[in-house]
């Protein structure tokens, strides 16, 4: 199958629909990793605010690694599962102390870190390092399903992976950057309408076009076999657990080395 018409369409729509989000103005893998985790369960508009607040509080992977558990959980409140915050801290500790603050770029090393699955690993690789890979995220699924599987129900990921892999461009021949490890910042790097056909610009186009499709057509990602509907928060165990954590934090009873409580 000739994928060039599909790629041209996605690139064109990506330019038209580009979202100038704050985590797109950095190549710092810590900042990009944080955005990937926050976006797993929270709307983009809310993440825009909370991402900045988090980085004001924990500006680098070292700052997060050295922070207390209670402080991390307090900063995470209202952002979904507390275990994601605990995994962020645990992974930050490994990156800071086992990797001297330098993020690994290989998928097998990234997924070995707490809380980092294949999609998050590929997001870090694409957006921080411009490396090619299979970034199979819900908006990416939406685009592929809408155009290439328009009438097919329950499409398994194994059928999507080869297409996502084939359409992702190769990385640049050279990638030069310098990281201020202490400050955790690489400076501004905006890529709207990026002329280079790179993994980073390609997946931005896929994400933005997919988000647009979800608002304008019946959600194609529901036809993915991997699709799961988020359970209601009201009256759920997640709500009870979040309330317990808030109470413990307010009372100062969630100390160092303590995990957030379980609700069964």
Language-model-detected regions and their locations in the chain:
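Catalytic cores of DNA base-excision repair glycosylases
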Residues: 2-9, 13-239, 247-263
């Amino acid at each position: 199958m000739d994928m060039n018409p599909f790629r041209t369409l996605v690139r064109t729509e990506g330019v038209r629909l580009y979202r100038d989000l704050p985590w797109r103005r950095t190549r710092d893998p810590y900042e990009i990793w944080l955005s990937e985790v926050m976006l797993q369960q929270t709307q983009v508009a809310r993440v825009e605010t909370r991402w900045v607040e988090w980085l004001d509080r924990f500006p680098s992977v070292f700052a997060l690694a050295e922070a207390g558990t209670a402080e991390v959980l307090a900063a995470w409140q209202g952002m979904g599962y507390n275990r994601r915050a605990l995994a962020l801290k645990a992974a930050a500790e490994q990156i800071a102390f086992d990797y001297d603050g330098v993020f690994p770029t290989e998928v097998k090393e990234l997924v070995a870190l707490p809380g980092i699955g294949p999609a998050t690993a590929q997001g870090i690789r694409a957006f921080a390092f411009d490396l090619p890979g299979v970034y199979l995220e819900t908006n990416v699924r939406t685009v592929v399903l809408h155009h290439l599987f328009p009438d097919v129900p329950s499409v398994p990921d194994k059928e999507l992976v080869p297409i996502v892999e084939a359409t992702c461009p190769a990385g640049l021949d050279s990638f030069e950057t310098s990281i201020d490890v202490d400050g955790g910042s690489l400076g501004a790097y905006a890529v709207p309408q990026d002329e280079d056909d790179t993994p980073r610009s390609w997946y931005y186009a896929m994400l933005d076009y997919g988000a647009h499709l979800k608002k304008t057509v019946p959600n194609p990602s529901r036809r993915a076999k991997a699709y799961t509907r988020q359970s209601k928060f009201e009256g759920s165990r997640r709500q009870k657990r979040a309330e317990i954590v808030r109470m413990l934090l307010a009372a100062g009873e969630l100390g160092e080395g303590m995990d957030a409580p379980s609700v069964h």
